[in-house]
Amino acid sequence: MAEDTGTNNEGTGCSGWFLVEAVVERTTGQQISDDEDETVEDSGLDMVDFIDDRPITHNSVEAQALLNEQEADAHYAAVQDLKRKYLGSPYVSPLGHVEQSVDCDISPRLDAIKLSRNSKKVKRRLFQSREITDSGYGYSEVEAETQVERNGEPENDCGGGGHGRDKEGEGQVHTEVHTGSQIEEHTGTTRVLELLKCKDVRATLYGKFKDCYGLSFTDLIRPFKSDKTTCGDWVVAAFGIHHSVSEAFEKLMQPLTTYMHIQWLTNAWGMVLLVLIRFKVNKSRCTVARTLATFLNIPEDHMLIEPPKIQSSVAALYWFRTGISNASIVTGETPEWIKRQTIVEHGLADNQFKLTEMVQWAYDNDFCDESEIAFEYAQRGDFDSNARAFLNSNCQAKYVKDCATMCKHYKNAEMKKMSMKQWITYRSKKIEEAGNWKPIVQFLRHQNIEFIPFLSKLKLWLHGTPKKNCIAIVGPPDTGKSCFCMSLIKFLGGTVISYVNSSSHFWLQPLCNAKVALLDDATQSCWVYMDTYMRNLLDGNPMSIDRKHKSLALIKCPPLLVTSNVDITKDDKYKYLYSRVTTLTFPNPFPFDRNGNAVYELSDANWKCFFTRLSASLDIQDSEDEDDGDNSQAFRCVPGTVVRTV
């Protein structure tokens, strides 16, 4: 009987912890290859030639370098193709700062993230600068050579080492790929950037503008010292604009402007813009700079912004001649200051000033004060040829004085020609509001004034009845005496005299050219003066008045209102004035509401309604033959052409 296989005493002693497996050389059913020798042991001799450990020769080194160079070229070309699409992300202007556009403009917070405070050199750049990358929109070879010739040889510290890649292999590829013309182009652009870092950038832009357009920028503009001064027309010269922005600039500015004159030029700095703009609303230099910096994608200090010379014929001729050429884009209506200086007819008309036209304008607009005439007429210089001739004259003060004098003469003659009825109608036509007459009546009742007797006295006063043409309103302070009389005098277009000027011989001179008058706040001395020297005047008789620099004038006193805190009816020394002065007493204070506004409104519109409603009672009603309208022709002091009816 055969012996049992395996081990004896299994599970006893040390053998109890181990399982001994049998070594099997071949499994049942395994196929054996024909070319495999079953008797040969696996010693590893078949893997001897798998690793090539032979010495490296010179030919193999050149092959590896060539392979690395070809792979680096392929990678560099792929990166540049990707950058070509996204080159517009940072500043693409050649005037921009290269490090700023790469490090700061990609992200506003990128510049704050630093590992070292003193490190200024960037080890790796996300974007190459425009000048050293083949973006497809760079300068041509001719422009690059021209720029190098202008800027001269580069300085020692202006090299392009900071723009290369840091890896040794990539640095070699970068040096071999770029040609000599590209290196010169990068050097010229570096000189431009260094030039703009100088102290006076504005002077540099002025010089560059003259090189581009052949004339000085100051020949087209008048400088504004303040950036806050507003103007409607602006001349802007902008440098370093991307070509894609120039195509959309006109459409972007159309909603804001009424006129644009655009000129584009291309030089070594990129696109240069010269534009004359008329905005719909006046803007300051700061506002214009912010607007154009947003549209053009350039910094504000790369622009020259000033208002145009509107009085220069040379500047107007420049805009006119370039506007009709194909070098400019013009939209909107040409400004009037260009038309005025380029059309012969307008130029001849500006040299002729006519005083009669100025007087007619002042008369039609009720301007009799010299300062108002000078200011208002000067503002018409933009659209009135006679006003432009006035501004160009050296005798403006004389013309203003003569105009005011003639206008006063015409107004006084017109006023004296009218009766009181016509004058009230004339003054009422100047007021457009309807108004209400009841507040005036309510105020009189508040002062205990009977309305019917008041109308009778007012009727005699308006018509200048002798010894009835002076009404004195007396009473305590703050009862509304001056307010009531001032509102009435304002509506009737009267004058105001004051006893404070009584030391002068001419303090009664305003009565010569007045339809009605007011003497406000008459004191004891004023009543004494009137009782002594003005009895004939209050009687309604003619009286001679002394006038300054003129002869005495014989006049009849116009209807006169007097306000006073002195009641002359209670003093016997004024007994000679009792029959000459009609006295009304206002005993009650003037009422106000909680907000401090007058309870009874004494406005021009209310006085108009008062005289219109009570015209029959006051005997100032228009007659029936005048109801059909006024057929009289308006006053004209300018010789006009004959009106031909069709």
UniProtKB/Swiss-Prot annotation:
- PROSITE patterns per record: SF3_HELICASE_1 (PS51206)
Instruction: Report which reactions are catalysed by this protein.
Output: Couples ATP hydrolysis with the unwinding of duplex DNA by translocating in the 3'-5' direction; ATP + H2O = ADP + phosphate + H(+)
Q: Report keywords, A-Z.
A: ATP-binding, DNA replication, DNA-binding, Early protein, Helicase, Host nucleus, Hydrolase, Isomerase, Isopeptide bond, Nucleotide-binding, Phosphoprotein, Ubl conjugation
Its annotated compartments are: Host nucleus
Its cellular-component GO annotations read: host cell nucleus
Q: How is it modified after translation?
A: Phosphorylated. Sumoylated.
Q: Where is this motif: Nuclear export signal?
A: 106-115
Name the segments for region: DNA-binding region.
Answer: 184-350
Q: Which residues carry this modification: Phosphoserine?
A: S89, S93, S107
Cross-link for Glycyl lysine isopeptide (Lys-Gly) (interchain with G-Cter in SUMO), residue positions: K556
Q: What EC designation does it have? A: 5.6.2.4
Give the GO molecular function terms. ATP binding; ATP hydrolysis activity; DNA binding; DNA helicase activity
List residues binding ATP.
G475, P476, P477, D478, T479, G480, K481, S482
Gene Ontology biological process terms from the UniProt entry: DNA replication
Q: Which InterPro entries match?
A: Helicase_SF3_DNA-vir, P-loop_NTPase, PPV_DNA_helicase_E1_C, PPV_DNA_helicase_E1_N, PPV_E1_DBD, PPV_E1_DBD_sf, Rep_E1_papillomaV, Znf_lg_T-Ag_D1_dom_sf
Q: Mostly located where?
A: host cell
Where do the record's region annotations for Disordered lie?
A: 145-185
The subunit structure is: Can form hexamers. Interacts with E2 protein; this interaction increases E1 DNA binding specificity. Interacts with host DNA polymerase subunit POLA2. Interacts with host single stranded DNA-binding protein RPA1. Interacts with host TOP1; this interaction stimulates the enzymatic activity of TOP1.
User: So what does this one do?
Assistant: ATP-dependent DNA 3'-5' helicase required for initiation of viral DNA replication. It forms a complex with the viral E2 protein. The E1-E2 complex binds to the replication origin which contains binding sites for both proteins. During the initial step, a dimer of E1 interacts with a dimer of protein E2 leading to a complex that binds the viral origin of replication with high specificity. Then, a second dimer of E1 displaces the E2 dimer in an ATP-dependent manner to form the E1 tetramer.
Q: Which family does it belong to?
A: Belongs to the papillomaviridae E1 protein family.
**This protein is called what?**
Replication protein E1
Q: Which organism is it from?
A: Human papillomavirus 13
